Swiss-Prot record:
It is found in: Cytoplasm. Its main location: cytoplasm. Its EC number is 2.3.3.13. This is 2-isopropylmalate synthase. It comes from the Bacteria. Residues 396-519 are annotated as: Regulatory domain. Residues 12-274 form the Pyruvate carboxyltransferase domain.
Length: 519
């Protein structure tokens, strides 16, 4: 592939917005401590830029940025801001502790947005871009400007907006496909023409931020690279507003597997992709579909007899990449009652969990208790421990009893509250799960409205467990929860408690939190 700008770096910058745009996916809200856990994993993955949130819209995002900035030194840390002086100043304060700060400002540019959202003329948009990018540069040296809804903006006006932003000091220009409307050819042509017609284009990095409303986010991001983009904005598992964003794992593996065609690299340590994906699934309670490219459970599964025969002869017949390249590896280390803390920590790191000393101590105590109940501890068991400890500080399930009462079910649950006190409640329902959720609601005081509920098996043979996935609503906001146990009713209780604890840990979630969407 011939790139449009030979002077640009041969390595694509990966801008991960899982903690900002990804979190805007319904049910994927994360409190500050969970964002820190995820940011550590993104750092270990090799992400170049981590967008941590929108500090002006949320105190939790402000706190998350502060926590992350104190710890992470390698990646650039970005925060989003509207073109408003107060937003920009708040964002700059949130970035004060960052070693490599970036201020990311955006403004809509399309005629539809100008007329109905901004109620601004072209001249007013240009004036605002110049004013607020200039202000941002007085506070932070690294400034990214995003022309929201760029792909539906008149080409001549988009060129003018880009010129003004560069003249005002922007170091990165992002041209988003905000509603996932464009096709690869249109995206490629847009980048090619804007770069060719804007003075100073060779002095900045052009970025693409593509949404997946028509399933083209990854294809459009690749087309943007062909048109000259040298930064791609993406998320783990493709989570994000509406249908999501460009999936980091898919984009990076395309560039790796088809490197002879694209001749462009990334800084991503691909062997950490699966563990990072699984960590996110646990944190937000949103599993990926089994046939999801790269990270789905079936991504390297072969059932057809013809395919299996070919694989036995040569793996290359039906596999274009090795499972180990993205982190699909089996542990050869057996964990049990004689395993030490170092062995447990090493396995947790391989699974994508980077723990503070206090959290590791808590997990190891739970590990030793589990070893009293079963001879061996699997990766699935460790992930359940993580869900029960570092993720679920709050109410813990102590015991439960389900019984039939005529045509109804009765549930008795006993919980340990955040202070360690025991709380017991009972409830009746139309079935065991309905009764269980009623008892949990009575015990915690959290009311959740169930939208969907699924149970499936994870693991193989004697190690198999039931995983419960539920989607619930609280104050008209959707949340996802996941629980895993050898008992599916217990797994359901853990999934329910995961959501309840998340709500109780973050008071903002107990209200209607407004997310401001970009691009």
């Amino acid at each position: 592939m011939n790139t449009s700008i030979s002077s640009q770096p041969p390595c694509i910058r990966i801008f991960d917005t899982t903690l900002r745009d990804g979190e805007q996916s319904p049910g994927c809200s994360m409190p500050a401590q969970q964002k820190l856990v995820m940011a550590r994993a993104l750092d270990a993955l090799g992400v170049d830029i981590i967008e941590t949130g929108f500090p002006a819209s949320s105190q939790s995002d402000y706190e998350a940025m502060t926590l992350i900035a104190r710890e992470l030194r390698r990646p650039t840390l970005a925060v989003l801001s509207r073109c408003l002086q107060a937003d920009i100043e708040t964002s700059a304060r949130a970035l004060e502790s960052a070693t490599k700060p970036r201020l990311h400002v955006f403004l809509s540019t399309s005629p539809l947005h100008r007329e109905h959202k901004l109620r601004m003329s072209k001249e007013q948009v240009l004036e605002s871009v110049h004013k607020h990018v200039s202000l941002s540069r007085t506070l932070i040296d690294d400034v990214e400007f995003s022309a929201e809804d760029a792909t539906r903006t008149e080409e001549d006006f988009l060129i003018e907006v880009t010129r003004v932003a560069i003249a005002a000091g922007a170091t990165t220009i992002n041209l988003p496909d905000t509603v996932g409307f464009s096709t690869p050819e249109e995206i490629r042509n847009m980048f090619t023409r804007v770069i060719a017609n804007v003075e100073g284009a060779n002095k900045v990095i052009f970025s693409a931020h593509c949404h997946d409303d028509l399933g083209l986010a990854v294809a459009n991001s690749l087309a943007a690279i062909e048109g000259g983009a040298r930064q791609i904005e993406c998320t783990i598992n493709g989570i994000g507003e509406r249908a999501g964003n460009c999936a980091l794992e898919e984009l990076t593996m395309v560039l790796k597997v088809r490197n002879a065609f694209y001749n462009i690299d990334t800084s991503i340590h691909t062997s950490r992709i699966v563990s990072t994906s699984q960590l996110l699934q646990r944190l937000v309670g949103m599993p990926v579909q089994r046939n999801k490219a790269v990270v789905g459970a079936n991504a390297f599964a072969h059932e057809s007899g013809i395919h299996q025969h070919g694989m036995l002869r040569h793996r290359g017949t039906y596999e274009i990449m090795r499972p180990q390249e993205v982190g699909w590896v089996c542990s050869h280390m057996v964990l049990g009652r004689h395993s030490g803390r170092a062995a447990v920590e090493q396995r947790l790191r391989a699974l994508g969990y980077l723990l503070e000393e206090e959290d590791l101590k808590l997990v190891f105590e739970e590990f030793k208790q589990l070893c009293e109940k079963q001879r061996l501890v699997t990766d699935v068991d460790l992930q359940v421990l993580m869900q029960d400890t570092t993720v679920q500080h709050g109410y813990r399930l102590a015991s439960m009893t389900i019984s039939d009462v005529g045509n109804r079910a009765n549930a008795l649950v006993e919980l340990s509250d955040p202070q360690g006190q025991r709380v017991a409640e009972t409830a009746q329902g139309n079935g065991p799960v309905d009764a269980l959720f009623g008892a949990l609601a009575a015990a915690t005081g959290v009311k959740l409205e169930l939208d969907s509920y699924q149970v499936h098996s994870v693991g193989i043979g004697a190690d198999a467990r039931g995983e419960a996935n539920l989607s619930v609503r609280h104050n008209d906001t959707q949340y996802e929860g996941t629980g895993t146990s050898k008992d599916i009713i217990e797994a359901s209780a853990l999934a329910w408690l995961e959501v309840a604890n998340r709500l109780l840990r973050n008071p903002e979630n107990m209200q209607n939190k407004q997310n401001t969407a970009l691009a």
